[in-house]
Design a protein with these regions (language model features):
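A short, histidine- and acid-enriched strand-loop-helix "catalytic/donor-clamping" loop
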Residues: 108-126, 140-141, 172
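A short, charged, and often flexible helix/loop element on the N-terminal side
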Residues: 50-72, 87-89
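N-terminal subdomain of nucleotide-sugar transferases
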Residues: 1-57, 80
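Donor nucleotide-sugar binding/catalytic pocket of nucleotide-sugar-dependent glycosyltransferases
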Residues: 137-191
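Histidine-centered beta-alpha loop that forms part of the nucleotide-sugar donor binding/catalytic region
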Residues: 10, 89-90, 112-118, 167-169
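A short helix->loop->beta-strand "cap" motif at the edges of active sites that frequently abuts
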Residues: 105-110, 160-161
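An aromatic- and histidine-rich active-site surface loop
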Residues: 14, 84-106
């Protein structure tokens, strides 16, 4: 029987599709997104969703306009009885998941995915440092996309959480097809210029 997993993530982005699909294949997974598109970039969501092996769900807007304060996370966790929860970075949503673990299900495994490089980790704002400090005492693991960050975390932040390096992945076959499409577009673009 597959373990139950809930993923809370900001948005669907092209570089996360294969990662999410891999998770969906291995776990009995449910995916909840905070936004219908990435805040810093705009992607063709309709097209991206064609590549997903799951149906995405979306969280209600942040409480009092605070983007990461989404109390429906607590009811989702209560109803779904997950074994593992994936969150993104260190934020209020992640703190709510940690609070749920402390108050309701101490055996819940919480894993965060962090894209910080070493400079970002070292120069984090005091708010992020406090959240990171609190959460690293509760999290089961931190997945870091940069090997140097993992090394820095291991030597500078010795807390309960385990650190592991896992690069942003894409299926090789899909990547090669997209590269081929992009190359033909570049050729067409260069001829027009």
């Amino acid at each position: 029987m597959k373990k139950k997993l809930i993923v809370f993530h900001p948005a669907i982005a092209p570089y996360r599709v294969d990662f999410f699909n891999s998770i969906d294949e291995i776990f009995d997974a449910k995916f909840y997104f905070e936004f219908d598109n990435a805040l810093e970039q705009t992607f063709d969501q309709k097209r991206l969703q064609e590549y997903l092996s799951f149906i995405p769900k979306y969280l209600s807007p942040g409480f009092l306009g605070i983007k990461n304060l989404r109390f429906d996370v607590l009811s989702i966790l209560w109803k779904n009885k997950a074994d593992v929860v994936f969150i993104s970075e260190y934020n209020l949503l992640g703190l709510l998941v940690c609070l749920f673990k402390i108050l309701v299900n101490w055996r819940l495994k919480i894993v965060t995915v962090c894209d910080d490089n070493v400079k970002m980790a070292q120069n984090a704002s005091w708010v992020k440092r406090i959240m990171r400090y609190v959460m690293l005492h509760i999290l089961s693991a931190v997945i870091l996309a940069d090997p140097k960050s993992m090394e820095w975390y291991g030597t500078s932040l010795k807390y309960k959480a385990k650190y592991c390096y896992f690069p942003i992945i894409q299926s090789d076959a899909i990547f090669r097809e997209r590269l081929k499409q992009a190359s033909s577009f570049i050729c067409i673009f260069n001829k027009e210029v």
